[in-house]
């Protein structure tokens, strides 16, 4: 194959991948998954991955491998379904890039350039997992994990790291103003900004933890109020959604995207982590909080809402579903954007009415086998009437 022939082949394959129609798959009544991933490393533009100059790249080989596209924040903006994607290269470094779709389920195309995120303080080794919030103050905020090497690590320890919550804001998703990293007495990941003021303050869902990986004595989804996003300092924090022994969130849990407001309460999507023989298993779960007090949990169905299925189980980090973006349309349709195994992005759709019904009418976890059997028998009895 000549250089020109290979280039035409690459272009045709790339266009076919992007424009392939994505079909829904009938589900459990709560949501419908879609058959194909919406974003992978292969969706990245060819001019990101290849030097297209025959003189400098006569074999037309990849010069910058885009290995994965996952863990994306989401927002409806100018009539388009927008994802701020965690893109990872072969060098393990993540960066943010915007992809947009006209319909939310397929035809996602990356913008021409990745986001150039300004640094704050010591340059970050890695940044990832942005949550987007269009706040009532008029700004779009992005909060993301900032990873740096642990300065107290022992000589030769090249794995220890420190996590902080990076904060940035924008009006156009192109030009970002970097604000100071969040200050907290603990390491923080999975920090999410509530979309409305609460008692005149900005409200944050937090996830305090003792270490970069381990929750230790910390963990759980926290709640904190702050005066300003221009310098976020957490001084008073409470846990509103706890970890619990022998559940899908016994090791860790964390808020996903910002909650969706409904007449019955705030809908929350979160992830829970438990240990198993193959390592850490990440699943998604839901809960609801009160409209009057968004820190008060009013419903939480037992177990997981979504878990890896089929080939979703396979990837760089096996047995993982993670979500940090969803979009609720004005007609009540909800687009749930989730990643599988730190490798690719998917979408599932539902409605606000169905998700509220799921949360309010699915019984909570009673924490023992005996109570689970009672819960099942109650359903059987109702169906036999």
Regions found by a protein language model. Give the residues of each.
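Glycine-rich, Trp-frequent "lid" loop and neighboring beta-strands that shape
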Residues: 131
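Well-ordered alpha/beta subsegment
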Residues: 327-335
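Beta-rich carbohydrate-recognition and catalytic domains
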Residues: 1-71, 75-125, 134-192, 196-251, ...
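A conserved acidic, glycine/proline-rich C-terminal tail/linker
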Residues: 311-328
């Amino acid at each position: 194959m000549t250089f020109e022939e290979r280039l035409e082949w690459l272009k045709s394959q790339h266009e076919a991948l992007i424009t392939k129609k994505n079909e829904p798959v009938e589900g459990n009544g709560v949501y419908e998954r879609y058959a194909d991933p919406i974003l992978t490393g292969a969706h990245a533009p060819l001019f990101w991955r290849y030097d297209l100059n025959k003189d400098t790249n006569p074999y037309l080989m990849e010069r910058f491998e885009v290995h994965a596209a996952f863990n994306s924040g989401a927002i409806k903006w100018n009539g388009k379904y927008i994802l701020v994607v965690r893109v990872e290269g072969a060098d393990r470094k993540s960066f943010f890039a915007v992809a947009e779709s006209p319909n939310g389920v397929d035809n996602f195309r990356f913008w021409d350039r990745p986001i150039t995120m300004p640094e704050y303080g010591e340059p970050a080794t890695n940044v990832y997992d942005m949550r987007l919030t269009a706040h009532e103050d008029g700004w779009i905020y992005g909060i993301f994990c900032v990873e740096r090497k642990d300065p107290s690590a022992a000589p030769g320890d090249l794995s220890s790291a420190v996590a902080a919550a990076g904060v940035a804001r924008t009006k156009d998703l192109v030009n970002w103003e970097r604000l100071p990293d969040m200050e907290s007495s603990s390491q923080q990941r999975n920090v999410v900004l509530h979309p409305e003021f609460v008692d005149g303050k900005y409200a944050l869902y937090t996830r305090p933890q003792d270490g970069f990986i381990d929750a230790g004595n910390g963990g759980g989804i926290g709640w904190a109020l702050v005066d300003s996003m221009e310098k976020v300092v957490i001084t008073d924090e409470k846990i509103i959604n706890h970890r619990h022994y022998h559940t899908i969130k016994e090791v860790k849990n964390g808020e996903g995207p910002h909650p969706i407001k409904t007449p019955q309460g705030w809908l929350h999507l979160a992830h829970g982590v438990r240990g198993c023989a193959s390592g850490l298993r990440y699943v998604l779960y839901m809960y609801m909080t009160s409209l009057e007090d968004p820190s008060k949990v009013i419903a939480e169905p037992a177990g997981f809402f979504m878990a890896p299925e089929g080939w979703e189980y396979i990837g760089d980090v096996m047995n993982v579903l993670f979500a940090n973006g969803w979009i609720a349309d004005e007609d009540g349709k909800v687009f749930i954007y989730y990643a599988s195994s730190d490798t690719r992005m998917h979408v599932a759709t539902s409605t606000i009415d169905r998700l509220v019904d799921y949360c309010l009418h699915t019984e909570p976890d009673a924490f023992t086998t005996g109570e689970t059997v009672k819960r099942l028998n109650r359903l059987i009895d109702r169906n036999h009437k």
